[in-house]
A protein has these predicted regions:
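Bacterial Sec-dependent N-terminal signal peptides
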Residues: 1-24
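A generic structural signal for short, solvent-exposed coil/turn residues
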Residues: 5, 102, 147, 156, ...
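N-terminal capping segments
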Residues: 22-116
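...with weaker cross-activation on analogous glycine-rich loops/strands in unrelated enzymes
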Residues: 117-186
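Low-complexity, Gly/Ser/Thr/Pro-rich intrinsically disordered linker/tail segments
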Residues: 180, 187-223
Length: 223
């Protein structure tokens, strides 16, 4: 079995697990099988496995990729204000570029540079549904408590942005953190200094945007 066949088998296992509701048992990791270039190519080549599936399956697959695979590859990649690396753990990545680069790597046909360099609120409005604004972390937390698990959001702060991910174990902020150039980290939202020190929050859901998900699977431009 060659590398591409191996990855196709992996994708089939993951998709089947999600359809059957057993995604927590799908423990194979992409990182252990292929390098990042092959990961990007094969994810893009094999999204059509879900093209006739209900939106729930597409949503769960995107959640799995962002929460698991993307973080596994990118964890620890340093932050820099001008960081635009295309390769995890090589060079540096700014917060906006972390979001748009990883979405591009998963096959979303978006304006990677334009969205990374615009205001985070504008990026959220172009990519997300169910957009809300809050003036405290407590209010944001209360909102997230009512949202479904396996959800992926983009959050915009005063001068920062990243993913919020809701899992069965809680809500996490995944972002390229500027403090001491820590770079890509994932932390519980109630333990995040970046969130707790902020005064304004705009959040929108990627996984609730069915039109975006369908265009992603069909390899069509989403904007």
């Amino acid at each position: 079995m060659n590398l591409s066949q191996s990855f196709l088998l992996y994708i089939s296992i993951i998709v089947t697990a999600f359809v059957r509701g057993n995604h927590q048992n799908a423990t194979l990791t992409v990182k252990s099988k292929v390098d990042y270039s092959e990961f990007k190519k094969t994810v893009n080549d094999n999204k059509n496995l879900l093209i006739n599936h209900p939106t729930k399956d597409i949503r769960n697959y995107l959640f799995k990729l962002v929460d698991g695979d993307i973080f596994d590859y990118w964890e620890g990649t340093p932050w820099d204000f001008y960081g635009k690396t295309l390769q995890p753990k090589t060079g540096s990545i700014a917060c906006g570029y972390f979001v748009t680069t990883t979405l591009t790597d998963l096959g979303f046909k978006i304006d990677r540079v334009g969205l990374a360099e615009c205001r985070s609120g504008d990026m959220i409005k172009k990519l997300c549904m169910g957009i809300h604004s809050f003036n405290s972390l407590d209010k944001l937390s209360s909102y997230l408590a009512k949202q479904p698990v396996n959800s992926v959001f983009i959050v915009g702060l005063d001068f920062h942005t990243g993913y919020v991910i809701k899992t069965t174990t809680g809500c996490y902020f995944m972002h390229s953190y500027y403090f001491k150039k820590q770079g890509v980290i994932k932390e519980k939202i109630d333990e995040s200094p970046a969130l707790s020190s902020n005064k304004f929050f705009m959040i929108g859901s990627l996984t609730a945007n069915e039109n975006l998900l369908r265009k992603w699977i069909a390899n069509k431009p989403v904007m």
